[in-house]
Amino acid sequence: MRRFLSALCLAFACLAAPAMAATSVSDDSQDADKLPSEMPGYSMGMLRELADRVQRTGLGMDMIPALYRPHYLSISDADLSMENEDIVFLVTYPDNRVRVYPRRVLVWHEVVNDVLPDADGLLPPPLPGVPEAAGEEYCITYAPLSGSVVAFRSKAGKYPSSFGVTGYLLNGNSMLYDRVSRSLWNQLLGICIEGPFKGKRLERIPVLSARWKGVKERYGGLDSQFNGKVEVLSRSTGFKRSYGKDPYGSYHSPGTYYDNNHLPFTIDSLDTRLPPKKRILGIEVDSAFGAVQKDAVRQVRVLNFTLGITPLVALHDEEIDAVRVFDRRLQGQEQPLSFVIFEDKLIDEQTRSEWLPTGKSTYGKLREKELSPLLAIDSMWFAWASLYRNTRIFPPPGQ
C-alpha cells in the first residue's frame, strides 16, 4: 500500500514537468497521415500528434494492476461493505446479465477484464497460451483523474485481448494497452493512437453511473424482476488495497482533487465554457459531439434537445440517481416525441402517454413502447472537450 501511494505522489510530481512523448511509430508518408481513422474527425496524422503529446507520469506499466476474471457477490453480500451514496457503474450484457462495478474498487485498478459465463454458469477455460481468446470478454475502464467510465468489447482489431494500464496520460485521461500487440489506446476516445492497431477503434457498450442505495433497492428487492440476476464486483481481488478509501480524495469532502478546478497535468486546449471538472455525459451522433450537463438534468428531470439532425432527450432516474439519453423517435417513426413533467409524471406531449426514466411507456396510447438509448460517456468536462473538439453543450451554458 505505501509503495503504491508513494508512486502515486511521484506521478503527480512528474506531471508538473514538461510532457514527455511516448515513442512514436515511424511513418514519413504524408499521404498515410491523411488517411482517416475509425474515429470521426481524426486522421492518422492527428493520431500521430496525439501520441507525441502522451505524458509519462512516473508510474510504470501495470503498476496500477488491472483485474482479470474477478469474483462477484450478490447484492445482499456486497451491501455489507458498501455505503448508500457510493457511486457504482452498471453494465447490462447481451444475455441480460447485470453486473455492478463499485467505483471504490475501480479507482484502484482502472481496468476490469471481464469474461461472461456460459449458459450453464461456467467460465470457459483459457486456451493454452492464449488466455484472451476464451469466452465472451469485455473491458470496463475507469480513469480517476478525468472521471470517465467507458466499457468495451475486448477486441484489439479483430483479436480478442485483455487490457492493462500503462500509467501514461493524454490530457489527463488514461492510456491503456492491449496484451496482444501492446499498442496504446486512449480510454476516452477508445482508439489506438500508436502501435500495430493504430487507427482502430474499440466497440463501446453502454455503462450507467448510479448510486448504490437506489441500485440495491431496484435490483435486489425480493419482488424485483432482477432478483438473483445481478452480480457486484467483489473487493476480494487478490490485491491489498484500502477499498474503503479513494486515493484521490472524495466527491463529498472539500479540499480534494474532485472539489477544485486545479489540473495537475498538461491539457492541450482547455475549453472554459464549463468548469473543468463539471460532470457531463458525452455523446456522439453522426460525427457530431455533445455534452449533457448532468446536474442541469437532475434539476429539471427532462431535457429535450437536438444534436445535428437527431432529436434527443435526457432523463433523470431519481431512484438510482442516473441520467440516460434517448432518441425521441420511436422505431419506424420519423416524427419525434417531446417530453415534459406533468403532475409529477413524465409524459409525451403528442399522446399524453406516461413514461419511465428508463425509456419505457407504462400507460396510454404508447404503452409498452420503448425509446432507443444512446451510448453516453460519463466524464469530467475538461477531458471530453480536449479530445472531442467542437462539442455542443446541453443545456447551453448560462441557461
Please tell me what each predicted stretch does.
Residues 1-4:
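Positively charged n-region of N-terminal signal peptides that target proteins for export
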Residues 7-17:
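Bacterial N-terminal signal peptides
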